[in-house]
Amino acid sequence: MAQKWQTISELAADTSRKVTHSPEEWCRFLTTAARFYKAYDFDDQLLIYAQKPDATACADMSTWNNKMRRWVNAGSTAIALIRKGYGGKPYLDYVHDVADTHPVRGGKDPWLWKLTEENREPVMERLRSAFGIDGAGDLGDLLMEVTDKLVQESYGEYLPDLLYEREDSFLEGLDDFNVEVLFRNTLRASVQYAVLSRCGLDVNRYLDTEDFREITNFNTTAALACLGTAVSQGSRELLLEIGDTIRKIEREKAKNPLAKSDREPYNDSRNFNTLKRERSDEY
């Protein structure tokens, strides 16, 4: 077990180096991480990306079996995550992606929200109200404004840790002011990318690789952890708000099916079961 833990620990370190190698590598990681904003922190997101970058919904075997009534496919490979037990002693926990499971009698699919033409405007109205943003007629522009505001308000909480942990990284040669500017800009672009990606928008309309050119400076595990944690927390706040709004809309649709938009046929039952899910079925 100790050897297995060491292998996964080394995988995490190797992946930290990999994702900071270039803007493209970092953005690929952000795409995966954005799908796991709710239940998994940065360290978990990194290991999920390392082992199954195309994963969409992960849970442990007990959750799949008992709550979702899904069995894990024979021969599938679990995703190992590092946990700390009594006295801080590390151990491994294992989760499986939904693609590696199959439903049995009474089986359920995890609820994964999706932005549509029907729910887009209510989501925008909710975001304007929740975050005090006026204007921004385009959803992408609104998300860019909201994330900018969130980062401006929160990056200072994480900056002291980064200033302390910058030793041996490329940040070490910079003064505090330039580290702050670099961190704020990279954090803002990263949260924006994660949120836009999870919302299914064309990220290239709003950001390009130049916005992530400084990611290579976070080239130690400790420095990247400071950035990654801030990205995870920042995107989580906004994505939870979006998910909650869409869930409420779908619950209302389930209660009043005849009130659906004419654009969506009433007899389209593809998502009927997911409309009945409780919040805890979201991944």
Question: Language-model features: where?
Answer:
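N-terminal accessory/interface modules of nucleic-acid-binding and processing proteins
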Residues: 1-283
